[in-house]
Structure formats: C-alpha cells, structure tokens
Amino acid sequence: FNTTERQVMCWLIKPEDLKWNNSCAKRLAQIPANGGTPLAEVYDKMHPILYSKKPDIFLTLSDGEPSDPYAVSSMIKSFKSFGIKMVALGVGRDTLSATIIATNLRHLGFERTLGVSRLKDIPKKVLDVLGSN
C-alpha cells in the first residue's frame, strides 16, 4: 500500500501461490515512497485478510512516521496476537534518517526493524529479513 493523490493504493508484489524471490523483491522496490501513508487505515483494511490468511510474517516498508502512532501500535499488537511476526523496513534518504525511521518503527511494536537508504538495497534487505525468519 502507498498513497497517490490522497488515495490508498494496493500493490500486488507476490501472488499467494508463489514463493518469495528476487523478482518479488524488485517489484517491491519499484513502489514509490511518497510519505503520508495512513498506516493505521491501511492496517485496518488488511485486518480481515490477515485474520483469515494468518501469514507467518507481515512486512511493512515505511519512509516516515505514521499519522496515528497509537492506532498503528494497537493494530500491530492485534496482528501479533494472531501469531503474525511484524517486521518493518525503514526507508530514509541517508543512513542516519533510515536508522531513525527504523528505530521509531521498533517503538511502535514491530518485532524486527531494519533501515535502508539506497533503494537498490531494498531487495537484498527484504530477502535477508524473510530468510532469517
């Protein structure tokens, strides 16, 4: 999910029947980061899907702070109660900002967070995160 002209957009990165691979990671890296994503709203829309599918891992990419951190933290707790491991990748313009974003995401309740400042590094970071679980 991301926002385009204040609309929440959904992107299909990996079909359900396909294993995660480099092609999926590259598709993920092509989603434009433009900030302003109402993460709690996105998670609320995902809630029925995640409840029914109960994936092992739910990966969030973020380029900043959620608009409602308390609601996001509550949703993360809810997803974790389903047995879903919540992981986040903070994307920043440089190493320092990426690290700050990743640290802030950790405070929301994500079990694992990483920072990345170069878009070309996203596929490897995603594969590293998913491979370590």
Give the residues covered by each predicted segment:
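Acidic, glycine-rich A-domain
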Residues: 1-133
